[in-house]
Amino acid sequence: MAKISKSYSCTSCGLVTNKWAGRCDGCGDWNTIHESKALSNGPQKVSIGIEKGEKILLSDLLPSSKNLSYSKSGIAEFDRVLGKGLVSSAAILLSGDPGIGKSTILLQAAARFGEAGLKVLYISGEEAASQVKLRAKRLGLSTAPIRLGSETNLRNILTTFEDEEPNLVIIDSIQTIWADTVDSAPGSVSQVRSAAFELTNYAKRTGAAVIMVGHVTKDGQIAGPRVVEHMVDTVLHFEGERGHQFRILRAVKNRFGPVDEIGVFEMASEGLAQVKNPSELFLSERGKNIPGSVVFAGIEGTRPILVEFQALVTPSTLGQPRRNVIGWDGNRLSMVLAVLESRCGISFANHDVYLNIAGGIKINEPAADLAVAAAIFSAKEDIIFPINTVFFGEISLSGAVRQVSQVDNRLKEAQTLGFSEAITAPRNKKKPKDGINIRETVNLRDFVNMMHKYKGSTEGLGDGKP
């Protein structure tokens, strides 16, 4: 391991040098150069670990859990994804495509945390402090109580933390940070792992929360070693299509809250605005009397959400028809098509199938199977379903429609937005839900027979606005 040399920093301007001087070359002040605290290289003695460690009972640790504090930013969608808010000592990794809005949402959150009384330190390795300040001015945050810094050397950053003692640290980004104890270029696997370890260790040792921005690869995976995701407490992913104004903040991992929780934001001129009722917004531009359009009642984390599934089935002249999907699992689409063909006798061998989820959101739960089958069947047979109907249910390979979780929450959200009918699997609770008609279907064949009655008819369709 490389030998660590002493470093000195100026308490007035922060200039770092490798030797002491009476006068700072940066600001000109006298007697402001002091030795900086060096980073620990970890255990070096062979004798460490030979003696038996102290036993700690879990019951003795329980009272200390009361010291775990939550801080709310006031941005409800951001706090929702974190759980109850920002946890002290938490290490958080935020990833997303370039230009999706990672720095914007963090700068907005930092400003709100600062206004709430937290001491916030924003370190940018990609922009100068003046550039961050200019962006803050554009977002209307020029007077926010945030301390800004532009640095990439890990030792200098941690020394600054020791001096400032912040409550919240934001590192933008972890791929630009380099440690002088690691003999490799910034952004390499070893550098990212070392920087993440030191920053996470700092959070656990001092009680400060650390948020690190991470780059992604071309296929959307977090760049760098997978071990970083295991180190941190929370992994957030910022997703969305550049052509859409919506941005989805999703919790991929969270030790302090539900996984797959989402926060919905809308890109505006003054930054990212939170969307308090995403279901209503996702359905605001839904057309009426259109084959292939259905509404799915889903659950993302703890939040019920309604989204529109759009399908298009066209004759194909290709030897292998296209199967294109946006926002859903392509393998699961192939399974639904196979079940429709095998169990219901609907052939797609000579047809291209396109599936899209409106608004740019991504759905992962199997409960969307029935909505996908309904959209494809509607597009294939040119059938228009009632616009006031929602669909949800998991489809098995036998064609059976299975029950899904949190049915009451799905129905409540649908009823709130004016939907009067739901088609799903048979429920254990036979008591009907007030205000909404539940139509149960045992298998996909019964569902297809049930929906055939709408062919060539537009009776029962709403006014296009649920």
Language-model features: locations:
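Peripheral, non-AAA+ core regions of ATP-driven protein-machinery
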Residues: 2-5, 9-12, 16-80, 87-107, ...
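Conserved RecA-like ASCE P-loop NTPase motor core of nucleic-acid helicases/translocases
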Residues: 120-124
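Conserved Walker A/P-loop ATP-binding site and its immediately adjacent core
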Residues: 125-131
